[in-house]
Each structure stands twice: as C-alpha cells, then as structure tokens.
Amino acid sequence: MKIGVMNNPAKSVYEETIAFGKAGYDFVDLTIEGPQARDVDTAKMEPILKRYNLALTGHTDPCLPWAYPVPGIRQACLDELERCARIFSALGAGIMNIHPCYFCPPAMRALLVELNIEALKPIVEMASSYGLTIALENFKPPFDRVSTFKTLLKKVAGLSLHLDFGHANMGQNNHAIFCKQLGTAITHVHFSDNRATADHHMPLGVGNIDWKNAVATLKATGYDGTITLEVFCDDSQMRFQYLDLSRKYLLELWQ
C-alpha cells in the first residue's frame, strides 16, 4: 500500500511536490487544473520526483464537460485529456483519474449515464495508448451507486473504479457496498473524512466515517495500491499536520 497527497492547484506544483517528498510520502496525486497547475513542465518535474523517490498518479479537472452531446465540445475535452495523458505518461503514471460528467441539456438528463458511456470509450482507448488505465471516480447521483458502475464497467472495456471513500459516505451506496461488489475493479483510492452532509475533506477520524471498517473492508478486497489522503486546509503548516495525523492513523489501521 502506498500513501500519497494531491497537489493544491492554487500553488506551484513543483513546490508542492518538493514538500510532499520532504514529508516522506510515496507518491503525488497530480491534478492538472487551474490556476497554478494548468500545465506541468515534465523536464522540471521529473528530477523532483526522482530526488524524493516519488511515484505519480494522474488526476484531471473535475469540471471538464467531456460527455456533453456536442461533437466539438467532446473533441476539445478529448484533446485536453490527451494533453494530460501525455504529461502523466511522461512522468511514469499508470492510472489517470476522470470524474463523471454531469453536463447535458435538461431534456437529456435521463440519458446521462449513456452519454458518459458513449464518451468514455474513446477516452479509455486514448489513455491506453499512453499506457494509462482510466479510473472513474464515484461522486454525486447517479454515479454514487454500484448499479451504475456495474453498467459502466460492463459497457466500457478497460475502465476501472477510483473509489473515493468521502464521496461514498454521502452517496446511495457506502464504501462497504462498493468494496464487496466491485472490489476487484478498484485501481485507485481517495481517503478523506466528512459528516455526510458535504465533501468536507477533513482529516481521518474527524467526521463520521468508520475508518476501522473502511480499511478492513478495503483490505478484504485484496487491494494494496495507492491511497491519496485528500485532506484540505488553507493553512499549509496545519495541512501537513492534519495529513501526518491521517497517515499515522491509516498505517495503524492497515497493520
């Protein structure tokens, strides 16, 4: 099991990565989004990763309307995702996250899952050409339940599941149901706490997620991959203290 942290896109991606390396994390969950992380100079980033022996996973902008049913919009989003894929691949990533697309005309709302399936196929194919596996993240309805993901995984060959435990705490199906029914499809994980009313991104143990059960259920699937501590705080010093407490708690529970 590897524990990593996501960069804050409002700060320098290079300074963030150096800070993660100095703090002893295993990998960077590199999100490519504005305002400060819209582009990444791989020639500048690669030696930083090597210096601190950091691996990397890819995280994409959650606001891209990649399944919107207008060909030009889909193509523009595919081009942007391919730009991200080139960066992730060059930096040694094997996983590339994508968020469900909720953008569609109101009269087509009932077709939202089908629109996502249709648009995911070329995205997964593109990512595969760069040696990347696309991991779709669970989030708001209807992408908050196992039944939707079973359909997606069946109809989109090569797709995998990015299980966000904080999101699952707010959704129709919690982490236990996802792990028990789709455990073998999980390729990446996000851990953060909340009180089920919003995506608070709290340190582990602060909200109402049962972390003993969460870790035990995840381990029972045989998962031993990357876990991102997605804990947010405006104060950088406090953020790393919260992250360190969360890491220690996770390591204790994982034993």
Predicted regions and their residues:
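Short histidine/acidic/glycine/proline-rich micro-motifs that form metal-
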Residues: I32-Q36, C63-P65, Y102-F103, F139-P141, ...
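Conserved radical SAM core fold
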Residues: P62-W66, Y102-P105, D193-D199
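Active-site acidic/histidine proton-transfer and metal-coordination neighborhood
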Residues: R51, A67-S160, M170, F240-Q241
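Histidine-acidic metal/acid-base catalytic patches
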Residues: M1-K2, P9-G21, F143-H162, A168-Q255
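Acidic (Asp/Glu)-rich catalytic clusters
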Residues: T17-A23, D39-G58, R83-G92, E125-S129, ...
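Hydrophobic faces of well-ordered beta-strands that scaffold small-molecule active sites
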Residues: I3-N7, V28-L30, L56-T60, M96-I98, ...
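A generic structural signal for short
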Residues: G4-M6, E33-G34, G72-I73, L111-L112, ...
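N-terminal pre-domain/capping segments
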Residues: M1-S89, R247-Q255
